[in-house]
Amino acid sequence: TDASDALTEAGFSPTRFAYPYGEYDLALTEIIRSLGLQGFGQQSGAIGPMSNPALLPRYPLAGVYVGESAFRDKLRSLALPIKHPDIDPLVSENLKPALLLDFVNPNVNTSRLTCYGPGGVMQISEEARGRVSITPASELPIGRSRYNCTLPKGNRYHWFSQLWMRKKTDGSWYQEP
């Protein structure tokens, strides 16, 4: 890429990429992976051994997200121990997409798993041992949305977030505020 070549010629060797507005699709994550870069979205969560290096989470630490208690919780969080799903976040027909999570340990107790998204608390259904389906209470709004899931572990939390993007009904992209 021209930008990468220009940085290399200037003596920089980039190793990380931040997705603008945290937006990505699977084709873009594959490009980031093929370039040997770590990719960072804007989905919340901790990085763990099963994290996708082309789509790593990062926490917001500004505005309403910067309080001391929230900061401490985020620093102490753990990655949700799941096999990370390869999901294209662009929603087109199904405006209430289900998120399937497969836990690394099928014996994990998912009864304390809590997920939030558009419309508040989400419905969690056990599909099989160690596999849950999460569905929103309402359709995703136009723009960016996230499903955020936490599972307590002592005084800490396992955390995972999934981005979704929905275009306008005419197929055009939403405008930034």
Where are these regions (language model features)?
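Catalytic domains of cell-wall/extracellular-matrix polysaccharide-remodeling enzymes
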Residues: 1-63
